């Protein structure tokens, strides 16, 4: 979600446990390069004014944390209603079930996307795009069953790049990967 927010000049917020509507608004205000005000209504008005002037996509990561706080979810709906800015919710596998409790909100979703495990071709594309060290197809095929979550993959790429630089590796072959993993 953070990567998408950066790519599309959006607003990225990571929801936190016990996050209130006030806290959420303060975070959005900060993302809009404003100083949060004392009154919640002032913060809401700043968000609306700034987003009407310069519309941006809002990405809310870990939306699961907000599912038990009706007012916070309604605040997001109000922001969308007033600004018409798209809001992307990113959550765990059962978040759509939790969101169904908010019928008037759930009906507004244009699309619900469930991310499945990466295929070998997907993994190769990720490694080709993010790693400075090339990987053979065979090495990617070996990695595939063991590392299939994006965060895991990013951590693995980082660790393998450090190892490659420390050990003069210019390309990861199956034999090398097999010895490391």
Task: Please describe what each predicted stretch is.
Residues 9-11, 21-38:
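Conserved NTP-binding/hydrolysis module of P-loop NTPases
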Residues 17-20, 65, 93-97, 118-123:
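Conserved nucleotide-binding/hydrolysis micro-motifs of P-loop NTPases
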Residues 2, 104, 116, 121, ...:
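C-terminal alpha-helical "lid" subdomain
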Residues 9-10, 101-117:
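A short helix-turn-beta junction within AAA+ P-loop NTPase domains corresponding to the substrate/partner-engaging
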Residues 1-10:
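P-loop NTPase Walker A phosphate-binding motif
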Residues 48-72, 86, 91:
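Conserved P-loop NTPase "ATPase switch" module shared by AAA+ and STAND
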Residues 79-103:
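Sensor-1/coupling segment of RecA-like P-loop NTPase cores
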Residues 30-54, 66:
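Central P-loop NTPase core of STAND/AAA+ ATPases
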